[in-house]
Amino acid sequence: MFAEIITIGDELLIGQVTDTNSAWMGRELNKVGIEVIRVVSVRDRADEIIEAVDASMKRANIVLVTGGLGPTKDDITKQTLCKYFGTRLIFSEAVFENVKRVLAGKIPMNALNKSQAMVPEDCIVINNRVGSASVSWFEKDGKVLVSMPGVPQEMTTVMSEEVIPRLCAKFRTDAIVHRTFTVQNYPESVLAEKLESWEMALPACLKLAYLPKPGLIRLRLTGRGQNRSEVEACVNTESAKLEAILGEDILDEEDTPIEILIGELLKKKNLTLSTAESCTGGSIAARITSVAGSSEYFKGSIIAYANEVKTELLGVSMETLEKRGAVSEETVIEMVKGAMKALKTDCAVATSGIAGPSGGTEEKPVGTVWIAAAYKSEICTMKQETNRGREMNVERASNNALLLLRKLVK
């Protein structure tokens, strides 16, 4: 069963608002066997909306439209859909009661807010319990178009409570089963070459996707078919073959973020952690503390951006900084030791590098990062040399630091 998503709003196309709705809908629909095959964003222009709707209705069984349902003049989705489906807007007392309930004590009722009770005549109107814009469900030639508000909280509520259950009741869907493996130690092209024979022999019901992240690659194995048990069995069989090929290079089989894996490992071994960060500027600590319960194992971080902080708080010697430089293996070793000593932890990670876009030299170009991980008296280091832009360099260094720590502690 195929679906297309149309998001409406000038704000999406000028980058003022990020479309998070489509990603959420894609995930939730996939869980029930509905595959999103296209996402289209259009301006608040009637002709462009009609063109997009007409094209989607020809290709897909289900068309989901978000946005343009507000009370102001630039919100034209309802009127435009009426034109497309050959119907008109009528006043709904039931919807008006909901509008009054939602706005009560918050916003005074005026003509614009009352206009929210105008709904297409030839459609099923679905109540929106968390907002004033109702949902319109159209059917034509065995296909369905659903128009929903673009406000994420409202859209997710009506999709979860009303739209998805109705779609499942109306359409027969295939079973879709995913298994995602997080793989370390491979560039994408090298991994693809290693898996070529296995991938070529995959059954027709399975599909493999490569999803690179900084320092990691996620392999998503997707099975699709009418019988869930058969699809799951097929996915399990091929997953076992993949595990045999990659062995310990598979970091995780549930697409679990590395910071969660680190937390689970530290709690299991009853260990504490600290970080000493220069070029990563606290991003490692931020990831660790984003996990609920991280206070059980994480003590703190020293952001040693300046050399004087490295010396005064972490005990890095001036001799090391002068002879080897801040971006060096020797410096991160002293930083990681200093973090463990200052914060009294069992483990620590340290980073120092040139994130960019400037600051690089011929000897140490932009993207050069030294990373150290320590577990009690044992220390290991690595040098990161790939330049992918400042943001990506920092993310990659954060990933590599946590991966290095996991390898050391595990």
Curated annotation (Swiss-Prot):
Organism, scientific name: Bacteroides fragilis (strain YCH46)
Similarity comment: family membership: Belongs to the CinA family.
PANTHER family cross-referenced by the UniProt entry: NICOTINAMIDE-NUCLEOTIDE AMIDOHYDROLASE PNCC, NMN AMIDOHYDROLASE-LIKE PROTEIN YFAY
Protein name, as recorded: CinA-like protein
Any single Pfam family the record assigns to this protein: CinA_KH
HAMAP family registered for this protein in UniProt: CinA_B
